[in-house]
Structures are given as C-alpha cells and as structure tokens.
Amino acid sequence: MSDMYHQLPPEIWVKIMDHLKEVSLLLTNKDFFGLFNLIDVEKNMIEHIVENGYLDVLKYIDSLKNQNKFIVDKEKFSVKSLDKYLIMSCEFGHLEMTKYFVSQGANVKTDNNMPLRLASQNGHIDTIKYLIENSVDVRANNDCALRMASLFGHINVVKYLVDMGADVTSDNNFAIIHTARSGRLELAKYLAEKGADIRASNDSAVIRASERDI
C-alpha cells in the first residue's frame, strides 16, 4: 500500500479522497495518514476507527497524541468519551478494542450496563464473557442481557448467561414469550427446561407459538 501511495503526488490523492468520500484508505499506513493534514474530514475519526475495529490505528493515534503531534490535534481526532467508545466496541464485538478502552480507564458498567446489553443483543459471546469476568453483573437491570439475547435469538449467549446465574423467568417470563413469538423452537424449549413458564401472561407464549404453527 505504501508503494501505491508513492505512485501519485499527494495533491492527486487528496482529489481522489474528496471524490470517493471514503476515509478508510487514509488509515492503511503512515503515508496515507499524513493526508489528514490536507483533507477536510467532517466525521469523527475515532468513532469510525472504533466501529471498524482498527485497534492498531487507534494505538498509533494515541502515540501521536502523546508526542503532541499537530496532525491529531484536531476535532476529528478528539476523544469524546472513553465510556462511549467502550459501548461502541462492545456493540460491534471488537474484544481487543474493548480491553484497550478498559485499560485506559473506561467503565465496564457505564450507562447502566449498556456494554453488556449491546454485546448480548448482538451475540458477541467473547465480549460478554470478558465483561462478566470483569465484574459486570450478569443479572443487571432485571436480566436485561438474557432478555436481549433471547429476543434476538442468540442461544449460545442465552445458555452462557444462564450458566452464569441469569434468571429465565425475569420480567414475567419475557424471554420465553418473545422467543415463542419469533418462532425459535429450540431456544423456547431450552428456556422451558430451565424453568421459564410457558403459560405466563395468560398463555402468551403458547398463543404466540400457535400463531406460528410451532
């Protein structure tokens, strides 16, 4: 990629970037990164980096900041909130980035345990295990993690959370009711085996299942 950079003068690359409206190329190596001095990028690059899991790039930017380099002393490289970026890394399942933010001081329980909720909702089992191993309460917010994992059909996550102490009957058997509504027979059977009440809320789960011919 560095060889490609040197095939064209910087001003041509700037025009290409302006035309493509794609900033990821600027993150491929130090040569392209230097074009940030010449290109007006409106988006916050830290958010873009976190969404895509570019941990090495994030560490490189942090090293430049520690050296007080002008190129990263701009709004597009500003860190709005470590906790916010931790939440994002958990949402997208970037485990190593999650660990990095925690090492920098981010709170794994931030925003009412939002990291665990979003990791469970999106089925990122390794991130979930890391959070729980680092003192996040598996039963936080009335077993929100279990309810979200059930709602979105992540059976491996549900099983892990139950093994760690989550209650399948929380919120008036929310998990099995919504699992039945979604037609996820295997997960519904598992929840019932673990004590969820199939007849809760006036047989809501049974009705939902019958509507789908389960």
UniProtKB/Swiss-Prot annotation:
Keywords: ANK repeat, Repeat. SMART domains: ANK. The keyword Lipoprotein does not apply. The keyword Membrane does not apply. ANK repeats lie at residues 41-70, 81-110, 111-140, 142-170, 172-200. Gene3D superfamilies: Ankyrin repeat-containing domain. It comes from the Viruses. InterPro entries: Ankyrin_rpt, Ankyrin_rpt-contain_sf. This is Putative ankyrin repeat protein R844.
